[in-house]
Amino acid sequence: MAQIPAGADRPGKLSRKQTGDAWELKARRWLEGKGLRFIAANVHGRGGEIDLIMKDGQVIVFIEVRFRQSSRFGGAAASVTLAKQHKLLQTAHLWLARHNGSFDTVDCRFDVVAFTGNDIEWLKNAFGEDA
């Protein structure tokens, strides 16, 4: 039996996952243009997911990618809640442990790449361990 593709209930529209993947790829390419090197995408851990992991010089950068059509409800950057920050921190901690590292031994930061309409905003060090 054939499977119904995601988003098939909305002909001509992408599923949420397809839309997210497209914006994450756009963010990755944009950041590579800024000199960052790609390490991994869509890294899962206990209840959380890191959209992109990249390297900026010697710094490991955990990146959350957000998109909003408009800033009517606060824009993309405002959508990274404290709860979301905690999930990202937990997932980063697990990823570092899997790679024989920790927040104490590896220089890292948490960035947000926010697309609001056609605007892009790169928030370096958007939050940290004390979130």
UniProtKB/Swiss-Prot annotation:
Ranges for region Disordered: 1-20
UniProt xrefs under Gene3D superfamilies: 3.40.1350.10
Molecular function terms from GO: nucleic acid binding
Domain of life of the organism encoding this protein: Bacteria
Entries under Pfam families matching the protein: UPF0102 (PF02021)
Family: Belongs to the UPF0102 family.
Protein name: UPF0102 protein Ent638_3585
Organism: Enterobacter sp. (strain 638)
